[in-house]
Every structure is written in structure tokens, then in C-alpha cells.
Amino acid sequence: MYICFEGIDGSGKTTHAALTASWLRENGYMVHEVREPTDSNIGSLIRSMLSSPDARTPDVQRMLALLFAADRLTLRSKIEGDWAEDVVVSDRCYYSSMVYQGPEEWVCEINRFAPRPDVVILLDIDVEVAMERCGGTDEFEDPLYLAGVRERYLELADKNGFYTVNAERGVNLIQRDIRRILAPHFGICSGGIM
């Protein structure tokens, strides 16, 4: 099973991916945690480009979309190969490119070989709350920009059947909702939920 956490910066993706992976391990599952960009050479190049001053220009966004698609192929062989019988929990997946690098049709085409998650959990949060969590220091943490990203995430969630979780609450409440979503997929009874 491939589980992906999506959401704007500051929504808690990294925290909840780690907590979910830990919970699944406690319930006897072999779990692999991944993130996008990955730790591959391509992922390192992506992180470098994301921190450049021109990261939001159209040409750099197109380059990033192509690099992200290539980076996802480094995951595909693991997810569909060695890890096929295990659980993969990811902090982002190809849906991030749809909201950050769009337009949607082009991003779908270049990601046609990217692994598709079985479950996507969108951690939805108000832009101002997310910016407070992040400290508002990142180039991508501009309120108008993030509001557009959030809106695109909500549209994708509606169109693609993501589970949407209110991420403005405390960690335990958010994690409880995530576990309630995932428990039926794993045959975990309610006693295994916070």
C-alpha cells in the first residue's frame, strides 16, 4: 500500500507521515518512509533549484516539473519492486507537481510513469495558520501564492477522492482522524486508534 500526505507548507505532512509510519510499524507492518524530493542526486538538484531566487519563474517551474517526474521514477522501482508487499508512506507525491508546477494535463503526461498512491490524505490548513507554523521565511510562503496552492489542492481532492483532514487542530486529533481513515485499509480494529 502506498500512502501519500499532501498539503501546503506548514500543514504537518512530515510530522503526520512519520507518526503514521510509526503507528503502522507498531501494528506489525513493514513501512518505508519517503519524501519528495527524494535523497537521490536528482532530489538534491531539485532542493538546490527550489532555494534559488528565481524558483517561481515559469521556466524554472517547468524544469522542476521535469526533474520531479524523473525523481519519482527513482521511487517507482522500489515501490513496485522490492517494497511491493510493504507499506510506503510518502511526504508528497506527483499531486504536488499538479498544484505547484501545473498546468494539470502537462504534469499528468510527464508523470504517467510515476507511482500512483493508493490513499492520499490532504492535510488542509488555513494559509495564515500555516505561515505562522513556518515562520513565513520561505520564498514559497507568500500568502497569495499559498492561497492559490491550497485552492488547487482542494480542487484536486474533490476531483480525485482524497481524504481531507482539518490540520488546524492539535497533533493528536489530526492523527486520530488519519488513523480512522487508514484502519479499515489495514484491518486494524478501533482499539488501535488514539
UniProtKB/Swiss-Prot annotation:
This protein's UniProt keywords: ATP-binding, Kinase, Nucleotide biosynthesis, Nucleotide-binding, Transferase
Binding positions for ATP per the UniProt entry: 7-14
Organism domain of life: Archaea
Assigned EC number: 2.7.4.9
A family per Pfam: Thymidylate_kin
GO molecular function annotation: ATP binding; dTMP kinase activity
Organism: Methanothermobacter thermautotrophicus (strain ATCC 29096 / DSM 1053 / JCM 10044 / NBRC 100330 / Delta H) (Methanobacterium thermoautotrophicum)
Any one Gene Ontology cellular component term annotated for this protein: cytoplasm
Record flagged with keyword Nucleotide-binding: yes
GN (gene name): tmk
Entry's family note: Belongs to the thymidylate kinase family.
UniProt keyword annotation of Kinase present: yes
Name this polypeptide is given: Probable thymidylate kinase
